[in-house]
UniProtKB/Swiss-Prot annotation:
GO molecular function, one term: small ribosomal subunit rRNA binding
Function: Binds as a heterodimer with protein bS6 to the central domain of the 16S rRNA, where it helps stabilize the platform of the 30S subunit.
Native source species: Pseudomonas aeruginosa (strain ATCC 15692 / DSM 22644 / CIP 104116 / JCM 14847 / LMG 12228 / 1C / PRS 101 / PAO1)
GO cellular component: cytosolic small ribosomal subunit
Similarity comment: family membership: Belongs to the bacterial ribosomal protein bS18 family.
Gene that this polypeptide is encoded by: rpsR
Name of the protein: Small ribosomal subunit protein bS18
Keyword field: Ribonucleoprotein, Ribosomal protein, RNA-binding, rRNA-binding
Keyword Ribosomal protein recorded: yes
PANTHER family with a match to the protein in the record: 30S RIBOSOMAL PROTEIN S18, SMALL RIBOSOMAL SUBUNIT PROTEIN BS18M
Subunit structure: Part of the 30S ribosomal subunit. Forms a tight heterodimer with protein bS6.
Family annotation (SUPFAM superfamilies): Ribosomal protein S18
Length: 76
């Protein structure tokens, strides 16, 4: 049987030296939200726990301020 190569996950925020995740940075936040509007877990993205917590808080703030949708757009 052939074993498939799994790409090593790494924390993008640690690599870039990000201190804090901003809720106004929508391009970054959209990368961590699934098509259905759910926050993608760290076991899939490889984000460290510290940044995953900041990410979740930032996404929730952006949703509350209507910068990000809570769910996908219905009726398409």
């Amino acid at each position: 049987m052939a074993r498939f190569f799994r790409r090593r996950k790494f924390c993008r925020f640690t690599a870039e030296g990000v201190k804090e995740i901003d809720y106004k940075d929508l391009n970054t936040l959209k990368a961590y939200v699934s098509e259905t509007g759910k926050i993608v877990p760290s076991r899939i993205t490889g984000t460290k726990a510290k940044y995953q917590r900041q990410l979740a808080t930032a996404i929730k703030r952006a949703r509350y301020l209507a910068l990000l949708p809570y769910t996908d757009s219905h009726g398409r």
